[in-house]
Amino acid sequence: MAAALGASGGAGAGDDDFDQFDKPGAERSWRRRAADEDWDSELEDDLLGEDLLSGKKNQSDLSDEELNDDLLQSDNEDEENFSSQGVTISLNATSGMVTSFELSDNTNDQSGEQESEYEQEQGEDELVYHKSDGSELYTQEYPEEGQYEGHEAELTEDQIEYVEEPEEEQLYTDEVLDIEINEPLDEFTGGMETLELQKDIKEESDEEEEDDEESGRLRFKTERKEGTIIRLSDVTRERRNIPETLELSAEAKAALLEFEERERQHKQGRYSSRRGGRRGGPLMCRGVGDQRRESTERGRMKDHRPALLPTQPPVVPQAPPPPPPPPQQQPIRSLFQPQPLQPLLPVQHPHHPSPPQGMHMPPQLETPRMMMTPPPVTPQQPKNIHINPHFKGTVVTPVQVPLLPVPSQPRPAVGPQRFPGPPEFPQHTPGPVPNSFSQPPRLPLQDQWRAPPPPQDRDPFFLGVSGEPRFPSHLFLEQRSPPPPPPPPTLLNSSHPVPTQSPLPFTQPGPAFNQQGQQPVFPRERPVRPALQPPGPVGILHFSQPGSATTRPFIPPRQPFLPGPGQPFLPTHTQPNLQGPLHPPLPPPHQPQPQQPQQQPPPQHQPPHQPPHQPPPQHQPPPQHPPQHPPQHQHHHHHHHLSVPPPPLMPMSQPQFRPHVQTAQPQASSSRMQCPQRQGLRHNTTSQNVSKRPMQQMQPTAPRNSNLRELPIAPSHVIEMSSSRCSATPSAQVKPIVSASPPSRAVAGSRSSQGKTEVKVKPASPVAQPKEEAKTETEFPDEDEETRLYRLKIEEQKRLREEILKQKELRRQQQAGARKKELLERLAQQQQQLYAPPPPAEQEEQALSPSPTNGNPLLPFPGAQVRQNVKNRLLVKNQDVSISNVQPKTSNFVPSSANMQYQGQQMKALKHLRQTRTVPQSQTQPLHKVLPIKPADVEEPAVPQTPRVASIQGRPQDTKPGVKRTVTHRTNSGGGDGPHISSKVRVIKLSGGGGESDGFFHPEGQPQRLPQPPEVGPQPARKVTLTRGGLQQPPHLPAGPHAHSPVPPGIKSIQGIHPAKKAIMHGRGRGVAGPMGRGRLMPNKQNLRVVECKPQPCVVSVEGLSSSTTDAQLKSLLMSVGPIQSLQMLPQQRKAIAKFKEPAHALAFQQKFHRHMIDLSHINVALIVE
């Protein structure tokens, strides 16, 4: 759809945009800037994907002419904006009208009239304006500076203004938008209605055209306007001139009629085929309306983006999805339209965030809708959906309901809606509107990237349709499993009155035009989405969290990719806490809670895929919502680097992250599952975040990255192969799934960005789903039979979708695993120590035995245990697939053995998981579990000690898989061991922080895992390291991560410090847990281990040597550390075995040169015990 939309958009006003869009230089400059500056902010990550690909490219291409034109034609632009805002208002005001669709069209028409004239006057300029607006939107959401730079590469001066202005504008716009929404609602209701009928026909073509143009340009137009000082004045002027827009509608009507006629022919044909082709007949109809809406939304976004800025981050995250389509430049634009949809999600976030802004605006749904959502709604149903809630008899009531609950709901809703994601975002935003908003959006951005981006075409609609599930359900569900979104729609639809907040967004975005029709479409879209999700398993990180932004708001966006994982972790971790608090908070906000149950029921069906993730957001959001502000900040910090902040921030942050990720993933790729499918782009596996990724996470995400990468891979954050599996186990959904989702994400990340996101999406959804079921019941009283039936159908569809996604995910993972196994087996054949696997098995057994003891203690929360259990089970499955994959790689020495061992471990882990969820985690997934499972570490040390050699070899493999597992388990432990996670995460961060700068506690873990997968490839040596130092390292890692001083243990140090990533992985699973919970115990055991191992380390195995590396070079390297006894080169195996005279030298060499690059080849240095 993105391509189709892009093409048609490009054809119309978009043609100019398209040409400029295609400019290679412009795109590069944008990317460069986006990369530099986007990376600066959390949202920037998303921006990179989205703005970079779509917005920034367009903007940079058009920035010179268009920006100048913008400045020169600020009046026109203002009018355009006015029309946009007018549209926004009209949407709300007109919501009274029967046709939300018309309403949107109307608004769009007005803006379309002006814009059509405007566009005719400045085809490029207008497009540019749109783009500029979109860019500004991002800019404002983002640091504003980076964004502006990114999208206004050529406008340094303007950029400066933008940067300065955006913040003011953000605040100002928010206020203005609120006012605007309030005033125009009344003013425009009449005018818009009048226009509605007149322009209805026109609007289709105009809005379609605008959609194309606005998707690309209008969006940037809005961004630019918002960023530009002119934009600031625009906001004010727009407010004043909104009536003008209506007035203009008379004059512009003629021009618009022509323009619309022309565009309709151009675009209707195009859109028809595009939208129809993409979405199907009904979808096409909806598409037209959606596009209209999108264009209107864009107009609104233009106007509202400033207002949305604080709240806009969610929008931006949604917008980021366009980046996935960026390849299709016009698709980007079309994505922009979908983007609005996704912004829709964010808008919904803005929706809720808007409440924070305009909490005083009980109509906030309306206002937010206008403010935040309206912009998104303009392009898609989001706004319409908002309108629908108002306009629908039912919707109006819901709107009112949200009004009351909005204040309370925002936060509580966060929890419930977190699963939807958008709600969470909104809720997130409510408390900490700016922070929450910007941060959740960040994740959403990436998450969106994760899941929604690929399915963006549908996502927008889903956003529109799923708008109710909104980000969380929508993106999460959407990305994770299209079915979940529909349930939220139903839930929201029926729940609409009750949890209007989420429902409203949902209704507004989704049902706005078709609230009722759309739901039918939903089913269609759902299927489509499922298709999308499968296609973009990662789809987001995004939904990774849409709730995408909400479910995975934290996860994908900020740490987009790590947060995804982190978020799942946080949610996992927080979930236990949040789950308790969440429910209470939720109940207080009665509506939110109903919504939560409501929304969650769909997720529950989704649980296998999305539940883990989604639920955590839902659970977490409320509790965290209140602290979300700080968490959001923390998220920021985490995003940047939470090494230190993680502990304090992590607890809150993590939940937030998770929610973020989850929201993001729903937004971006609400759940890994959706993300994966959506983000299939990013992550194959289960694809939210997005999500650090969504791209894989996971962030499902996830999604949703090391951070970013992860987000995209999964949103970052959302990566959960495991998560998917975890999701499969609804039991573990809340915590396990959350934790699973991140791990899954990591696995998926290893496997593929898609998987990661997909999984992540799944987790969020699953968790949310159970609640949703409750919610369904809770909200059922308020629901009419029709709504309930809708919801039930949607839930069923979600379930089916989840199953399908799960199957796909598993298939993907299995295939990936098979590939990895083949690769690893090949490597293993080349490597020695195939005998080690059996000892590892023993070790595993031993570890498992201790694990129960330790494992039980590890399970701090019953929830955690259950979660871990489910998660472990899922992880075990995943690990079989994903770890098998990793293991083969990891166990280069003993590929088959490693696999066996791994499987054996997994089997044991399964057993243990069932017995002691934590234990298996600590063992099978010690790294992950170890964080929470100190006992795991302890037992682990014992195990490693007993079969030191075997342990080292087998363990390393275990650890290696552990690395993968580590992420997975990490998530688990995160979910299971909420409290421990902080410290563990910290440790992980310290040791693994290097690996994952995200610094997101869990996100970090996941991102690391994602990165680790890549590392897994080059991890033959790492495996070796694991074999010797690795095994020790995991235990030592705790100490090492805690203080690399464990260096004395040498092995530990080497693995912990040198293979920081590896160590982190290990530490995560094993060592970290030790240092965290039993930092000291572990060190002792580590020391023992070291002692046992010390005799062993004289021999160093250097793997992954470049064929051009000579023994002389290698010898000089070795001699630089210490004297060597012998050096044996095995060129056919691309490895060398050297024996040092002193074990300390071997350790030092391993520490110094592990993952060192020689002749463009990264060598893996492992200590070999003789």
Swiss-Prot record:
Give me the ranges of the annotated region Disordered: 1-152, 199-221, 259-708, 721-784, 833-863, 942-1050
Q: Which GO terms describe its molecular function?
A: lncRNA binding; N6-methyladenosine-containing RNA reader activity; protein-macromolecule adaptor activity; RNA binding
Stretches assigned to the RRM domain = 1098-1170
Compositionally biased tracts (Pro residues): 311-329, 419-433, 481-490, 554-568, 582-630
Cellular location(s): Nucleus; Cytoplasm
**Chain positions with Omega-N-methylarginine modification:** R1028
Spell out which residues are annotated as carrying N-acetylalanine.
A2
Bias (Low complexity) ranges: 335-348, 357-372, 394-403
Write out the entry's keywords from A to Z.
Answer: Acetylation, Coiled coil, Cytoplasm, Isopeptide bond, Methylation, mRNA transport, Nucleus, Phosphoprotein, RNA-binding, Transport, Ubl conjugation
Record's protein name: RNA-binding protein 33
Organism, by scientific name, is Homo sapiens
